[in-house]
C-alpha cells in the first residue's frame, strides 16, 4: 500500500468516526 493511500484510508476512517460521533 502506498503511503498516500494509507493516509487517505486513515483520514477517511477519522472523518467517518467524527461524523458518527457527532
From Swiss-Prot:
Entry comment describing in which tissues the protein is expressed: Dominant isozyme in roots.
Cofactor note: Binds 1 copper ion per subunit.
Cellular compartments per GO CC: cytoplasm
Catalytically driven reaction(s): 2 superoxide + 2 H(+) = H2O2 + O2
Disulfide bonds: none
Major localization listed first in the record, in broad terms: cytoplasm
EC number: 1.15.1.1
Span of the signal peptide: none
Origin superkingdom: Eukaryota
Cofactor(s) this protein cannot do without: Cu cation; Zn(2+)
Molecular function GO terms recorded: metal ion binding; superoxide dismutase activity
Compartment(s) where it occurs, according to its Swiss-Prot or TrEMBL record: Cytoplasm
Entry keyword set: Antioxidant, Copper, Cytoplasm, Metal-binding, Oxidoreductase, Zinc
Function recorded in the entry: Destroys radicals which are normally produced within the cells and which are toxic to biological systems.
Subunit structure: Homodimer.
Similarity comment text for this entry: Belongs to the Cu-Zn superoxide dismutase family.
Name of the protein this chain belongs to: Superoxide dismutase [Cu-Zn] 2
Amino acid at each position: 500500500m502506498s503511503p498516500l493511500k494509507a493516509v487517505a484510508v486513515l483520514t477517511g476512517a477519522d472523518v467517518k468516526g467524527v461524523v458518527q460521533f457527532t
